[in-house]
Amino acid sequence: MIVKSFVLRIDSVNEIVSQCKYNTISIIRLEQKLNDLFYLLINKSIINKEAIDNEIIAITSYLNPLFQDFTHNTPLIDFIEFIKGYLTHAISYNVPISSITDYLLAQCTNVCAKAISQLAGVNFMDGRELVVCEDKNNINSFNWNSTLTNIRTKCHDKQQLVISGGYARTLKGEVLSIGKGGANLMASLVGVAMNADRIELFVDNENVHNVSSI
């Protein structure tokens, strides 16, 4: 078994899909450009949630190539409507910007990774169901026992699997980012827990580092 982490570049979707088909557990994270589009959207919505059309259009246009093979782009349309509804709700209840950002980016990672899994014809798993942190204010406070138990229990019979990467849950169920290298960390955790033959960690400049599993 090989465990890989991928940066989801929209212009490389076909290549990523092809690599997810062969005895591979793939961890997907978003490209920085898409993260930046969400930061703009969230900051603009805080100022005036009625004036975010341009930001919504930018995100939709960016994601459209990933969903063009789905009937009527339904998953993307549903996700865009979800974003609008969530922002209205979160802003009304004064949810902290950091929590809004983590939650929406985790949801986007989930939607994109699920699309990749469907295009590849393999199973999908929400990475937030695997990695557990003790404290939302300390991303290094991993609950290793719970995390490794989750991975071994939920992935043990999966030879082909796509996982949304970079986000975790606290013991209280709160969603949080585990940092820019979160998908690589998750790939390493999965690889070690599953005794993978090889772990491949992809970085933004497209260099690939192959790390033997422990």
Which residues does each PLM region occupy?
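Nucleotide/pyrophosphate-binding catalytic subdomain
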Residues: 1-214
